[in-house]
Amino acid sequence: GYLGGYAAPAYAGYAAPAYAAPVAAVAHAAPAVAVAHAPVPSSAANTYRISQTARLAYAAPAVAHAPLGYAAPAYGVARYAAAAPALGYGYGAYGYAAPALGYGHALVH
């Protein structure tokens, strides 16, 4: 994975329904959610690791619940987002993704 821009293709990048199924099993991983809400560490390495784990916690549930099978922003509450970016850069016309590090709400417009 990587820190900026769109969600890593292995997880959700432009995820079509056919690609959504493999990550759906991770959708309710409690340990990942717990790590995602942990305080931001001072170590850049830990920040990177947590951001990757948080991407599973936030992007995977969206893949499991979004009506169109796309990776919608945090927890899948946005109906028509194209791909849930890792750090909150959303498609403005469809919804914004909550940042991966500890924010649990999507801003839906």
Swiss-Prot record:
UniProt keyword annotation of Repeat present: yes
Keyword DNA repair attributed: no
GO molecular function annotation: structural constituent of cuticle
Domain of life from the UniProt record: Eukaryota
Renumbered ranges of Sequence repeats: 7-10, 15-18, 20-23, 29-32, 59-62, 71-74, 83-86, 97-100
Entry keywords, A to Z: Cuticle, Repeat
Note on domains (UniProt): The tetrapeptide (A-A-P-[AV]) repeats found throughout the protein are also present in many proteins constituting the protective envelope of other species.
Function, in words: Component of the cuticle of migratory locust which contains more than 100 different structural proteins.
Protein name stated in the entry: Cuticle protein 10.6
